[in-house]
């Protein structure tokens, strides 16, 4: 592969770094976003993701960009994303067909909205519950970058778990990680900026017996392209911000605004969820996903898909002032409309 294109400008870094025989599985950014919406909407219930549900979510995401499908087609890796984007649950099972014992993304999602009979009644949320992680969340999100990068920017609800922690001789895993390791209906998701660190950490953990582990495909770089707002708190690093398209005129930079540090934020606000849903609509298109959660959202049907995907403004059809019934009405989701 050449180092630079014909015009001599440096060649952009690839968004995905697929390798053959990857030990870990991958979860698409769009699938992760769907899982986030479900978990946030049903946060007052015991959540469990099943492989079948993830498969359905991934299938509903099958209309994602052709570029992603082309990349997946070129890889023989075990963790390559499927051309179909089922539900988050589908995604997990579809990539590892022979592993019946491991917790798949599908298994995690299919149980969303159902009470865990063994655990009895649903836990009542304390007044300060919004400052805490979602109870019984079906996924554990780990940021494997260094602590400074985490404090500058991270996905809402992620825990800081620098990759160097894996090198510890004693106690390399927190209690949360041990609780989620290979637990039924639970998965662990690792991410970084561009898959460099996350792929190493995921490989190491899989070699140490983690069977329900996933890597966020494309990392923050792809996440920033598809979801410029909503999923992240803080200021994205320059390496994750989308470059100008070839031939476009670069505007003279204005005064540089100071980068805002990440908040100690564990839950998504209603505004965050609205933005995530709108970017999902822009990426997939409501007509291509009749089984998606927002199929009955009248505002979503009026959505206008912007020309550019990365770094775009919020789609013009996105509701900004009124409540989104799909996001905030947990009763609607309890019926599992994605089935």
Swiss-Prot record:
It comes from the Eukaryota. GO terms for cellular component: centriole; centrosome; ciliary basal body; cilium; cytoplasm. The modification Phosphoserine is found at residues 62, 65, 80, 87. SUPFAM superfamilies: Rhodanese/Cell cycle control phosphatase. Its main location: cytoplasm. The modification Phosphothreonine is found at residue 75. CDD domains: RHOD. The modification Omega-N-methylarginine is found at residue 309. Residues 62-73 have a biased composition (Low complexity). It is found in: Cytoplasm, Cytoskeleton, Microtubule organizing center, Centrosome; Cell projection, Cilium; Cytoplasm, Cytoskeleton, Cilium basal body. Keywords: Cell projection, Ciliopathy, Cilium, Cilium biogenesis/degradation, Cytoplasm, Cytoskeleton, Methylation, Phosphoprotein, Protein transport, Transport. Residues 82-99, 286-299, 313-332 have a biased composition (Polar residues). Residues 135-232 form the Rhodanese domain. Required during ciliogenesis for tubulin glutamylation in cilium. Probably acts by participating in the transport of TTLL6, a tubulin polyglutamylase, between the basal body and the cilium. This is Centrosomal protein of 41 kDa.
């Amino acid at each position: 592969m050449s180092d630079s294109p014909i015009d001599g400008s440096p060649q952009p870094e690839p968004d995905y770094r697929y390798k053959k025989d990857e030990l870990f599985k991958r979860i698409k950014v769009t699938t992760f976003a769907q899982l986030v919406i479900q978990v946030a909407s049903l946060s007052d219930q015991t959540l469990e993701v099943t492989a079948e549900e993830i498969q359905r979510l991934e299938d509903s995401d099958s209309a994602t960009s052709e570029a992603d499908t082309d990349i997946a087609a070129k890889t023989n890796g075990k963790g390559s994303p499927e051309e179909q984007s089922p539900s988050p649950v589908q995604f997990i099972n579809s990539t590892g067909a022979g592993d019946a014992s491991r917790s798949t993304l599908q298994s995690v999602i299919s149980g969303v909205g159902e009470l865990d009979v063994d655990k009895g009644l649903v836990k009542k949320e304390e007044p300060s519950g919004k400052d805490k992680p979602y109870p019984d969340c079906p996924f554990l999100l780990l940021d494997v970058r260094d602590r400074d990068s985490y404090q500058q920017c991270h996905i809402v609800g992620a825990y800081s778990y620098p990759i160097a922690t894996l090198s510890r001789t004693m106690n390399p895993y927190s209690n949360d990680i041990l609780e989620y390791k290979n637990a039924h209906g639970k998965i662990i998701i690792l991410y970084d900026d561009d898959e460099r660190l996350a792929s190493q950490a995921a490989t190491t953990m899989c070699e140490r017996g983690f069977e329900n582990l996933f890597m966020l495909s494309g990392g923050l770089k792809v996440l920033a392209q598809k979801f410029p707002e909503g999923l992240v708190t803080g200021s994205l690093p320059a390496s994750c911000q989308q470059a100008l398209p070839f031939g476009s005129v670069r505007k003279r930079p204005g005064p540089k605004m100071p980068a805002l540090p990440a908040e100690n934020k564990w839950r998504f606000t209603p505004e965050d969820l609205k933005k995530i849903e709108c970017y999902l609509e822009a990426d997939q298109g409501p007509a291509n996903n009749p089984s998606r959660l927002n199929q009955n959202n009248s505002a979503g049907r009026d959505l206008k898909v912007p020309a550019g995907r990365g770094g775009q403004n919020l789609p013009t059809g996105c509701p900004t002032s009124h409540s989104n019934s799909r996001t905030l009405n947990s009763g609607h989701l309890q019926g599992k409309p994605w089935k």
